[in-house]
Amino acid sequence: MNSLPTMILAATLGALVGARAAEAAQPDADIARFITAKSNQVYLATRDGGAPVPPEVWKMFTAASSGDWKSVTNLLQDITANDHSGAMHRLAPEIWFRVQDVGGFCGLISSNNLKFIRLFAEEVFKVVPPGSIYFGGSDPGRFIITALSRSQEEGQPFFTLAQSQLVDSVYLTYIHRLYRQQVKLPDQTMVNEAYQEYTADARQRFEHDQQFPDEPKQVFSGEDIRMVNGQMQITGQVPFIVINGLLVRDIVRLNPERECYIEENFPLPKWEWMYPSLEPAGPIFKLRRTPLEPLYEETVRNDREYWQRLTRRLIGLVVHDETDLAEVCASAQELSGKSKDFQGDPDFLQDENVRRTFSRLRSAGAGIYTWRVSRAKSSSERRQMVREAELACRQAYLLCPKNPEAVARYLMFLISEHRIEDAQKFITAALKLNPDDQTEKDWARYIRQMSDWEKNHR
């Protein structure tokens, strides 16, 4: 029985952590409430002879209640290594995912300024209506929203799902129990169907590349497909990314009465079905059920104004369409050091993790606009999408010049627009701020080769 003895054990073990955490700042009331709720849920789920709870779990909850974020992070690593990843006796879902929620959030607090953690949450809560379904992609997008919601279990203010774990049958079991039919979710049959849909498509793309080697490759970057003894084998992260995307699609279809929102995890070109239905909404996207052709003028205008306000607040800059590329690069140089006459938030400038988070959010928007450039139905729509894509690329870069995703996204945009000279200027400036980054060195070499080719074929 996991009842009073367990609680006494937890208190005893917790005292060991509490002694070390005595000087730690106590969590804010809403954070303390979240930690207590998750701890109580583990206790209630296991008190009547359920799965055993390792003592490190109670230690972790106690450390979290004391605001000892470093100890929480260390204990989560121990729990993951000893009782979850590759362990013979893995933690039960009702324990593991609650441990992960608390440990993941506390880890973010330990490495990010809490002010900006709250800013992200506030911006998401502003745009997602009550009762909606929200797919968190990155660790911040998942753990922050889970922790700062009024109640994850009751879907208050909305229902949060981890998009990157939908393919995991253990996670699906957990959220089925968690939401108790409030949200309709895929069953194992639907997961199997998504897997079969992906493998059939992967086989078709692989066979195309084998039969037509001179045509553009259809196999995705990072998708390792091989034929072994007549059987197709696929390795890498891509299958999981694509299948998770198909399960997001299924959840949207299963819940026609609920609005859906998504925070991008990986860049999503492999979720081709989703792009036409994504609409910028604050720092994330609304996922509509029908494609938007084209994006509403009001949506584009609101997105531009939103990020102009936010970049002014965070980095003290407003980028305009007519801002010269050299000026953007010079501003990035200033924002990477001690900026003169800085008009933004100095705390933001000093927090590289937070800068990367907001840069990634804006870069995701640039990806949507770039995708629409090549699919525009008119020259005026194309010009508008080019304009919005470049603005978003520049803002993402200035928010965090050392974010390789923002650098790569802007370079790919410039190359797609046949602006090789600008791409060369940009990567030269970016490398000055990140001289040891091998990916950026590779980009510089590639763009130099493109430039040489253009000169030789004029």
What kind of region is each of these model predictions?
Residues 10-20:
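Hydrophobic h-region of N-terminal signal peptides that target proteins for export
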Residues 18-401, 405-407, 415, 419-422, ...:
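ER/secretory pathway lumenal C-terminal domains and tails of membrane proteins involved
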Residues 1-8:
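Bacterial N-terminal signal peptides that target proteins for export
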